[in-house]
Amino acid sequence: MGVVLLVRHGQASFGADDYDVLSETGWAQGRLLGAWLAERGVTPTAVVHGAMRRQRDTALAMAEGAGWAGDVPPVVDPGWDEFDHVGMVAAYPHLPADLDLTDHRAFQRVFEQATAHWTAGEPGDFTETYDDFETRVRAALDRATVSAGQGDTVVVVSSGGPIAVACGALIDPDARLWQRFNTVIVNSSVTRVVVGSTGARLLTFNEHPHLEGDHLTYR
């Protein structure tokens, strides 16, 4: 049986000019996760990450924490990229004019409303439709599971959205459950997928025992 570990990137720079940069906490989360996995004897046969900086740097931090650096060169698969959440919110037709993007709670409320609008296929000037997003993530998940042969461990560093879509697809391919998963995925958490003769199955979701106190973040 093979295993795919879906890892959400560490904390990025919410409210900054460039969100796609790990915070100091984000770097620490990646190193803590790598050390935690290494302590449990996890040695990846392949490491995959999306094309985003926060995903790449989380994979780097994990390798540093685990001592994997240089052992398994990472492979870039843009299918694991996050959707343009900033552009999606900006294109939401009911966006409040006075929304403070640095206010976590206010942003989260509007983000969930905009995401529901986008997922339902409602009109908007979006850079990517939800259906296109779901299709590319499912294709990336297929590539990862196919590469996880008997005894293999494939580590995939991605983002909350793609991991949520993958979980929804594994539980019920006909249901758009991803929004419920997406709102609770912790930075640097691990979601385990096992791959056997009957295909891929979701084993665990959102593991984060390596995090305590201020290292436990959602955004």
Tell where the protein language model's regions lie, with residue ranges.
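Loop-to-helix element that buttresses phosphate recognition and phosphoryl-transfer chemistry
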Residues: 3, 10-62, 129-136
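Generic beta-sheet signal
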Residues: 4, 152-158
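Conserved beta-strand termini and adjacent loop/short-helix elements that scaffold enzyme active sites
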Residues: 7, 77-79, 205
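Active-site metal-binding loops of divalent metal-dependent hydrolases
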Residues: 10, 160, 206-207
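Phosphate-coordination/substrate-recognition cap region in phosphate-metabolizing enzymes
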Residues: 34-112
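Acidic, low-complexity terminal tails and accessory targeting/binding regions
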Residues: 83-105, 146, 150-153, 168-219
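Short glycine/proline- and acidic residue-enriched helix-loop micro-motifs
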Residues: 98-132
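A mid-sequence, solvent-exposed acidic-amphipathic segment
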Residues: 126-153
